[in-house]
A protein has these predicted regions:
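Auxiliary, metal-adjacent structural segments of Zn-dependent hydrolase domains
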Residues: 55, 72-141, 152
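Non-catalytic architectural context of zinc metalloproteases
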Residues: 3-90, 200-215, 231, 264, ...
Length: 289
């Protein structure tokens, strides 16, 4: 063919749209950080390598924070912290301890079939939403984004709570029917319906909860927040199974909590390669363990 010098430019039909790829790599790499954060960035890099997660610090998390539609999340560089490096370091130290509770390849298995995405964790300065959350998980492209407020006193339970949300997100992506709602509802009191609105609790929010009832057979939920919806119910159970040894043992005296945990454990085993796993922390107190 003969090119025409003055012809209008037309995109080739063979051209590849790289916009999504550009977004992926931009979110993966983050932005350069100031020298004052280099030490915590180096620590985060080591955790990424050890556990198979991605960690974004300070301004690196800005784009991910802005992608959340139901909360306003402030990055640590914009939160007016008196010592940003120290605040981030505290959270990373707790994150290190918490991630070590999970099987070696657990988080790598949460990536897609191409090895992309997975769990991305971000220490943030503040989360503003209807329930004043101290942790939040959202999905974006192939990522399960976990945001943790650096100002809280104890991180481990919150991190485990949000890791369950990320785990459930991956499970449902692989098999939407992994949790049979009718089976789950049979683990709840007769006639019970989740409130579905944490900002407007039920008239008797403590009923049937571990911190209110005296008899194990009357306990169906960890606390009032667990009565919000099935996902928060499951996340509360896993939070205490993973991060609170004393409460976990007491919770397992409840037949309903045992049944719920068994359903959760089955969903994990059905959607992860567990052949190399042993002594799973979340299964250690099950009657069959």
């Amino acid at each position: 063919f003969t090119p025409q010098a003055n012809a209008p430019a037309i995109d080739s039909p063979m051209a590849v749209d790289t916009s999504l790829l550009d977004v992926y790599w931009s979110e993966l790499d983050g932005q350069p950080l100031p020298a004052t954060l280099q030490e915590v960035r180096d620590y985060a890099d080591r955790l990424e390598e050890r556990y198979g997660v991605t960690i974004l610090l300070s301004s690196q998390a800005k784009e991910a924070c802005e992608s959340v539609w139901d909360a306003v999340i402030t990055t640590t560089d914009e939160a007016g912290l008196s010592d940003e490096p120290h605040a981030i370091a505290r959270m990373l130290e707790a994150l290190d301890r918490t991630l070590a509770l999970y099987p070696e390849d657990f988080f790598r298995q949460m990536r897609n079939s191409m090895g992309e995405g997975g769990v991305r964790i971000m220490p943030v300065g503040h989360i503003d939403n209807d329930v004043n959350a101290i942790g939040l998980t959202s999905e974006s492209y192939e990522w399960q984004n976990i945001f943790i407020d650096v100002n809280i006193d104890a991180f481990e339970g919150t991190i485990c709570h949000e890791i369950w949300h990320a785990t459930e997100g991956v499970i449902l992506t692989r098999n939407w029917d992994s949790f049979d709602q009718e089976e789950w509802d049979r683990c709840n009191p007769d006639g019970f319906f989740y409130n579905e609105d944490a900002g407007a609790p039920a008239s008797d929010p403590e009923r049937w909860t571990f911190f209110y009832e005296f008899h194990p057979q009357d306990i169906y939920f960890v606390d009032a927040y667990a009565r919000t919806n099935a996902k928060e119910d499951r996340a509360r159970i896993m939070e205490y199974m993973m991060a609170s040894e004393d409460v976990a043992g007491a919770l397992m005296q409840s037949p309903a909590i045992v049944q719920k945990l068994e359903i959760m454990c089955r969903a994990i085993r059905d959607n992860f390669d567990t052949s190399g796993w042993s002594d799973l922390r979340w299964e250690r107190l099950l009657p069959s363990a």
